[in-house]
């Protein structure tokens, strides 16, 4: 579907995709996401329920279920045909210690009332000391010995705490001036005779946090906003109060770079999370997009402002400059070569002077050096005469 719309023939006009064609593939799931055309669990019961595999068949259709097995639990779910706890007491209740068996023919039901008072040793024993008559679970234990028959109502020690729980007879925190409650600050001010501190002076010290808990008199985060709020570092700096309110609000639509940015490439306009990717090789919208792109390039070439680079070859402008620079450099090299070809006065060679200094000490080479100097002087005189002749000829011309 859609191949004829994107054919390369130029005789027929290009067709457009209709809404029905565009939505034609919405009912199909791609293979990478699965499929909805084969065996499914459509119509199944809720999660964890047994599957109905005997009442419905693809070929025979609906099959009437056999209700004879509805009173029997399958073995994989358990069974209700053997020994059970039917008729037992609730969870956590004491188990009947007297056998109560009715499905054994040879056993008789025994109801020994004498044995119901005694707990067997495997479960414990209540014939000795117990907690019968104690208070509820977690209550304070009565530290005074409750001995039956001897001072049963003696309350003389009820106001004294035994040492295993502490004591209330020595130094305590009773009468502290701080408000009651866990974690209250202890009042450490001592009352000195002749130097009584009034209540106003005592309350004035509650404004300050003591040093061992920190302090509340220096730089804080008071008024900085809610938790994880971006800190406003512009208006409260030195000179920030002079900034106008309009300038302060300009940066409110920009996400700072430390948290990311909303000014560059993003995935805005993408499909929803988890949407299958379009894996078709010949997508019509791609070819249409390329054609629109080429048309936009052509329009730009026709209406581009003077001096701008070509969109097809954006580096052509720099290429021309490079060629001009290379041609000017080559012309300079040619002019230098022409100047070098002109006759120039020969300069005395340094190598010959060095050799003359080395040969001064040799007496045998003095004569040769004198001859060479005479020859050089003659050559210089000849060159000067030639130059004078050339100048005279130029003046005559």
Swiss-Prot record:
GO cellular component, one term: actin cytoskeleton
Effect of disrupting the coding gene: Recessive lethal. Severe defect in pharyngeal pumping.
Gene of this entry: clik-2
Keywords, alphabetical: Actin-binding, Repeat
PROSITE patterns reported in the protein's UniProt record: CALPONIN_1, CALPONIN_2
Protein name: Calponin-like protein clik-2
Listed InterPro entries: Calponin-like, Calponin_repeat
Region (Disordered): 301-397
A molecular function GO annotation: actin filament binding
Pfam family for this entry, one: Calponin
Basic and acidic residues biased stretches: 321-332
Calponin-like repeats by residue range: 29-54, 73-98, 119-144, 161-189, 209-234, 255-280
Protein species of origin: Caenorhabditis elegans
Family: Belongs to the calponin family.
A GO biological process held by the record: actin filament organization
Biased composition (Acidic residues): 344-360, 367-397
Function per UniProt: Required for pharyngeal pumping.
Annotated TM spans: none
Tissues and organs where the protein is expressed, per its UniProt entry: Expressed in pharyngeal muscle cells (at protein level).
């Amino acid at each position: 579907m859609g191949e004829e719309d994107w054919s390369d023939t130029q005789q027929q006009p290009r067709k457009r995709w209709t809404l029905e064609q565009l939505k034609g593939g919405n009912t199909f799931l791609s293979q990478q996401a699965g499929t909805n055309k084969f065996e499914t669990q459509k119509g199944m019961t809720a999660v964890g329920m047994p599957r109905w595999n005997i009442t419905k068949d693809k070929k025979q259709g609906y099959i009437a279920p056999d209700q004879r097995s509805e009173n029997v639990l399958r073995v994989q779910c358990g069974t209700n045909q053997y020994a059970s706890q039917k008729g037992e007491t609730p969870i956590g209740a004491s188990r009947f210690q007297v056998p109560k068996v009715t499905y054994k023919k040879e056993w008789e039901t025994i109801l020994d009332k004498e044995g119901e008072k005694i707990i067997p040793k495997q479960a414990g024993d209540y014939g000795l000391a117990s907690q019968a008559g104690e208070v509820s679970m977690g209550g304070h234990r009565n530290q005074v010995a409750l001995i039956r028959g001897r001072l049963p109502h003696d309350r003389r020690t009820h106001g004294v705490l035994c040492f295993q729980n502490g004591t209330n007879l020595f130094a305590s925190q009773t009468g502290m001036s701080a408000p009651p409650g866990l974690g209250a600050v202890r009042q450490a001010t001592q009352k000195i005779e002749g130097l009584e501190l009034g209540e106003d002076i005592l309350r004035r010290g509650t404004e300050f946090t003591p040093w061992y808990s920190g302090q509340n008199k220096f730089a804080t985060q008071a008024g900085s906003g809610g938790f994880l709020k971006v800190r406003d570092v512009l208006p409260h700096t030195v000179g920030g109060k002079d900034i106008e309110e309009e300038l302060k609000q300009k940066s409110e639509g920009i996400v700072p770079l430390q948290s990311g940015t909303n000014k560059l490439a993003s995935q805005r306009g993408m499909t929803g999370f988890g949407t299958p990717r379009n894996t078709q090789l010949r997508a019509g919208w791609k070819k249409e997009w390329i054609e629109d792109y080429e048309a936009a390039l052509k329009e730009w070439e026709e209406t581009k402002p003077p001096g701008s680079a070509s969109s097809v070859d954006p580096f052509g402008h720099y290429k021309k400059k490079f060629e001009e620079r290379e041609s000017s450099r080559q012309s300079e090299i040619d002019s230098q070569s022409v100047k070098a070809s002109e006759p120039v006065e020969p300069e005395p060679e340094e190598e010959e002077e060095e050799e003359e200094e080395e040969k001064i000490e040799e007496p045998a080479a003095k004569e040769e050096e004198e001859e060479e100097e005479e020859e050089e002087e003659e050559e210089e005189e000849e060159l000067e005469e030639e130059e004078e002749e050339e100048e005279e000829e130029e003046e005559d011309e």
